[in-house]
């Protein structure tokens, strides 16, 4: 895939948000997308509108244990750190080493944040960090392009790890996953965010 074409899309996208995006962050994102589009799942980082739609679903006052799946360049991570309680534990999962590096460099001294690679191992990393159950799981994973067995394993791990009143908040670029999520969760609220590239469905799921 031609990074010049992608870069032009991001340039246009940045002006629709009314600001210039961080050059290093976005060029890294573009390169990783061009190399592994199935892993990255999107041509651009999430917009501020999608970020707000996702993270406004979280009860920040009471959320002490949070996991983020598929952190990318850390757009959500950055806002999670801002909003979270001082004593919150945040498990951040990102499989791409270059994107992991960006997140690690941005949050070198956050004592409650730990960085991991494989979201399928969510339960193991919770145990390692002294967490019994999670209050919220925030997901940017591109489930529709992941191997089906991997998607099942990740969703099973999420259901297992959430508190009974916990929420799974995820976005997707199509409604394909809606019926899958309905099989895992008893309740769901859906929101469509037009101001994102591409537009996205936000699913807030709980049991």
What are these regions (language model features)?
Residues 96:
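Conserved SAM/SAH-binding beta-strand->alpha-helix loop
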Residues 63-72:
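Conserved class I S-adenosyl-L-methionine
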Residues 73-85:
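Conserved SAM-binding loop of SAM-dependent methyltransferases across substrates and taxa
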Residues 25-58:
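Class I SAM-dependent methyltransferase Rossmann-like catalytic core
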Residues 99-128:
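S-adenosyl-L-methionine
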Residues 193-207:
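Core SAM-dependent methyltransferase catalytic element
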Residues 165-172:
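Conserved beta-strand signature within the Rossmann-like core of class I S-adenosyl-L-methionine
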